[in-house]
Amino acid sequence: MNFETVIGLEVHVELKTKSKIFSSSPNAFGAPPNTQTNVIDLGYPGVLPVLNRQAVEFAMKAAMALNCEIATETKFDRKNYFYPDNPKAYQISQYDQPLGRNGWIEIEVNGKKKKIGITRIHLEEDAGKLTHTGDGYSLVDFNRQGTPLIEIVSEPDIRSPEEAYAYLEKLKAIIQYTGVSDCKMEEGSLRCDANISLRPLGSDKFGTKTELKNLNSFNFVRMGLEYEAKRQEKILLSGGVIRQETRRFDEATKTTVLMRVKEGSEDYRYFPEPDLVMLYIDDEWKERVRASIPELPDARRKRYIEEWGLPEYDAKVLTLTKEMADFFEATVANGADPKLASNWLMVEVSGYLNAEQKELHDIALTPESLAGMIKLIQNGTISSKIAKKVFKELVEHGGDPEKIVKEKGLVQISDEGALRKIVLEVLDANPQSVEDYKNGKDRALGFLVGQVMKATKGQANPPLVNKLLVEEIGKR
């Protein structure tokens, strides 16, 4: 029997407001434990929450960017459960009247585009953070308690781990572009739980789902789903039954491990939050927020293709993060050829960032210096090979590319007389290669070009070297 995989994702995104969702405590990552809390965060008796307007507007902005309908009336509810990182014994969330519904995003996998529905987006507060010491007790840091979150719940439209990965990449890009969150998984500002079930191919009835947690990277989401699909398939093929449960992805073994039998919504005993009034969102407020949404990845990608003639793949890679897209546009605005700028960012810059595990803002390279270097290539001052030496200096130390070229003596040799002399010396030293080229072996010319470049320490103008070699060989 063949099975179809059915996946839905629940993504929690921390909003980068200045203060928390229901209190005036600062909302910032990395402070010493329990230094960014107050009596509201800690649930002291008699205290009352006050809703953060910016958190609401950030949630609206994200929901609109994800094509959601924004509620005219929405409310908050208490989700009741006990856990050491939840001092009130309930979480303020939204249950039956979420802020946003019926959204979608478009993904592309293996050249095929597909819309993934978004069931709902709602606002809630984050819990504190537990650290298990391993010697019999746990530490609780309440700095995160009360941080504003949006939970983005997808429709069960995802049919493979690859589609799940593409959905998360696209979702992250859109949220980052809106500016409401930095979406740093390593800091917990973007977290994902996955629901997965199998059903017979062709069936429209959902199977019993399993929820996966501890998915701390997009790759772990993909690996966790791949393992869980195989685990469930094995059980079903052997005549077994899938239980509704929550499982944890084990990063060491790349398997999923049982955490607990899955709770239903009735276990949380939701009821309306009595300390917060109904929230009304009129059309004027909606339009004001909508007007603040910047150009999003798909629109930017289309513009790069139409205005600058970039290949679709280049445009897609460049717009994957707002930081890279902004850097690219600033480089072009400073006079760099768009295609050359694209190539340098996609190959050399991205390669350096990946190797060094850094972000664009961590390096000394600026759009102005990259554009300056590219213009030196364009006007023939340096070759692409020499440019790599300049690039290394710019990335690590910054500076003016023109000044670096002069100080290090890297100016490309374009003097025809000087190069012709070197070409003649190379031809005299390699008569066999000359004969090979005359006999139709084109690779011999490449060897001779390499010898000239070696003699000039990479500073000869390659097109001019080619031209002179062909001319001089023709005379022999």
Swiss-Prot record:
GO BP terms: glutaminyl-tRNAGln biosynthesis via transamidation; translation
What PROSITE patterns does this protein map onto? GATB (PS01234)
**SMART domains associated with the record:** GatB_Yqey (SM00845)
**Top-level taxon of the source organism:** Bacteria
EC nos: 6.3.5.-
Keyword Ligase in record: yes
Q: Give the keywords, sorted.
A: ATP-binding, Ligase, Nucleotide-binding, Protein biosynthesis
Signal peptide residue numbers: none
Quote the Pfam families the UniProt record gives.
GatB_N, GatB_Yqey
Question: Is this entry keyworded ATP-binding?
Answer: yes
Task: Enumerate the GO terms in the molecular function aspect.
Answer: asparaginyl-tRNA synthase (glutamine-hydrolyzing) activity; ATP binding; glutaminyl-tRNA synthase (glutamine-hydrolyzing) activity
Catalysed reactions listed for this entry: L-glutamyl-tRNA(Gln) + L-glutamine + ATP + H2O = L-glutaminyl-tRNA(Gln) + L-glutamate + ADP + phosphate + H(+); L-aspartyl-tRNA(Asn) + L-glutamine + ATP + H2O = L-asparaginyl-tRNA(Asn) + L-glutamate + ADP + phosphate + 2 H(+)
Q: Which InterPro entries match?
A: Asn/Gln-tRNA_amidoTrfase_suB/E, Asn/Gln-tRNA_Trfase_suB/E_cat, Asn/Gln_amidotransferase, Asn/Gln_tRNA_amidoTrase-B-like, GatB, GatB_C_1, GatB_Yqey_C_2, Gln-tRNA_amidoTrfase_suB_CS
Biological function: Allows the formation of correctly charged Asn-tRNA(Asn) or Gln-tRNA(Gln) through the transamidation of misacylated Asp-tRNA(Asn) or Glu-tRNA(Gln) in organisms which lack either or both of asparaginyl-tRNA or glutaminyl-tRNA synthetases. The reaction takes place in the presence of glutamine and ATP through an activated phospho-Asp-tRNA(Asn) or phospho-Glu-tRNA(Gln).
Tell me its family.
Belongs to the GatB/GatE family. GatB subfamily.
Relate the assembly described in the record. Answer: Heterotrimer of A, B and C subunits.
What protein name does the entry list? Aspartyl/glutamyl-tRNA(Asn/Gln) amidotransferase subunit B
Q: What is the lineage of its organism?
A: Bacteria, Bacillati, Bacillota, Bacilli, Bacillales
The gene name on file is gatB
